[in-house]
């Protein structure tokens, strides 16, 4: 049931429902009762992931083609990879949670109205208020009708109700951070020597190089290789809280030998 007088939700036993996420309400994330004791508490905590990769390393490619007549092309590429490591995306947790509905800030699109489960209609009306009975509460048939109405209003919702009183780390924000990154690429062209003789140049090579040109990863954050700094533990690994991604660089140049 729901009591609008104190804005609290109650279970079938008449007791207020509270979880480690704070006061419960329809549409909230449901946590698994690992111990089976009928209550979700600190005893239900489990290991959510591993920041250490199962396999990591790198490999390179080198390619040369051409001759003295038309010049020589060269290409080198260096790749790095990691498989099996996981990252806690605290940025997604922070920007995907609303701690005070009157203080929305920098929230992600998946918790926008129409995408998140909400107790409010599009016109701003509070749905439970439409089903308050003569006893001043939403209960019995009124509660069932409210649940049905909420199901209609939230038919297209793709994420749970993000309004929460507390933060709880769940596997929703633990992501696979495996990746394949093109760490470095160089493409060069060495001009034929016969073209350079008149300029008294022995060899001339034009090149382009770049670093961190692309990264293939299922991770939804800015970069799976995060550098973490937290107030609690500055040495923590595998935690992304608005960490800067690796920079990308481009270079053009020419090598001359006289």
Specify the residue positions occupied by each region the protein language model found.
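Outer/extracellular conduits and scaffolds centered on Gram-negative outer-membrane beta-barrels
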Residues: 1-258
């Amino acid at each position: 049931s729901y009591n609008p007088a104190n804005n609290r939700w109650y279970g079938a036993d008449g007791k207020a429902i509270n979880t480690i996420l704070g006061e419960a309400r329809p549409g909230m994330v449901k946590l698994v009762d690992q111990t089976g004791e009928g209550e979700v508490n600190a005893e239900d905590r489990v290991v959510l992931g591993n920041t250490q990769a199962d396999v990591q390393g790198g490999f390179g490619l080198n390619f040369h083609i051409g001759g003295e007549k038309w010049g020589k092309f060269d290409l080198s590429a260096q790749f790095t990879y990691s498989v099996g490591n996981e990252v806690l995306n605290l940025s997604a947790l922070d920007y995907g949670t609303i701690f005070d509905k009157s203080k929305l800030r920098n929230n992600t699109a998946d918790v926008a109205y129409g995408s998140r489960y909400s107790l409010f209609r599009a016109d701003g009306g509070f749905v439970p208020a439409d089903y308050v009975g003569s006893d001043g509460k939403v209960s019995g048939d009124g509660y069932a009708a409210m649940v049905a109405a909420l199901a209609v209003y939230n038919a297209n919702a793709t994420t749970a109700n993000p309004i929460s009183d507390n933060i709880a780390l769940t596997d929703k924000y633990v992501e696979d951070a495996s990746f394949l990154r093109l760490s470095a690429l160089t493409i060069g062209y060495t001009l034929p020597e016969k073209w350079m003789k008149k300029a008294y140049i022995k060899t001339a090579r034009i090149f382009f190089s770049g670093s961190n040109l692309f990264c293939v990863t299922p991770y939804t954050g800015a970069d799976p290789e995060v550098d973490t700094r937290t107030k609690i533990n500055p040495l923590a690994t595998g935690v992304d809280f608005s960490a800067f991604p690796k920079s990308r660089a481009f270079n053009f140049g020419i090598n001359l030998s006289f």
